[in-house]
Amino acid sequence: VHTTQFAIREPKHGLFRPVLRLVAEALDQHEAKSRNIPVRIAGICGHTAQATAEATMARELGYHAGLLSLAALDKADDDALLAHSRAVAEVLPILGFYLQPAVGGRVLTYRFWRRFVEIDRVIAIKIAPFNRYHTLDVVRAVAESGRDDIALYAGNDDQIVLDLLTAFRFQVGGRLVERRIVGGLLGQWAVWTHRAVELLEQCHALANTGRAIPADMLRLAAEITDANAAIFDAANGFAGCIPGIHEVLRRQGLLAGTWCLDLHVRLSPGQADEIDRVCRAYPHLTDDDFVASLR
């Protein structure tokens, strides 16, 4: 999602199916060489007709699930949102997606999420409202549902480390229920991905000990948030989020440029300087050497 763009769906570009097919082919090659079988997740957008068509296409191309954006249904009430979600889930298992309003999402209440997790073919939720209250709404809804087969994924790029380390506990029916966010579907992890894998493993290891969070992890959490602010262009309401990701990949030689399908989307003034700053300040967050070793 973060290294393509929502605009691939527009008829004038016609890139949605080619992109899904290309990724599927790359995953096929990976599976042929490795014992690891990745979960294949396609982004699903639009009103019900478009979303079910995209889900059908993804299923035909071998995808296991769809990450369901509700951004297009910005005026719909909970009943309509749930009917839409059920329709897509009939085609393909779904991951819920709480997208922050600053980039086209909408506020989704605890009551919505409590009903959403009653859909049988919901297998996970990406939590990305960039809001602590709204994050808790989702985790509590899952905890109170009694379902332990729904995975929670971090999407709050401003709080990656603490989301992965926190044990969320709620009283449910007189007993204590604990849920954890088990992984991330993060734009920040579209870059410096080798380090992201190491970070996730480190967070899992710490969480499994049950010990207090070390001070160096709290410091690392702040450093990653600072780096993300530059890459995502937080100072300008995330206007340069996609080209910011592209710029990091360009510097590593993985992309030829930062162009976007929407020609108006480009790096914000001063954003490249901010990326320079965080790269100098936090070289341990980058994976330039790893990328260079594979070229």
What are these regions (language model features)?
Residues 19, 116, 275-276:
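A structural signal for short hydrophobic/aromatic patches embedded in well-ordered alpha helices
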Residues 23, 27, 31, 142-143, ...:
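Hydrophobic, Leu/Ile/Phe/Ala-enriched alpha-helical segments that form helix-helix packing faces
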Residues 226-295:
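C-terminal extensions of enzymes
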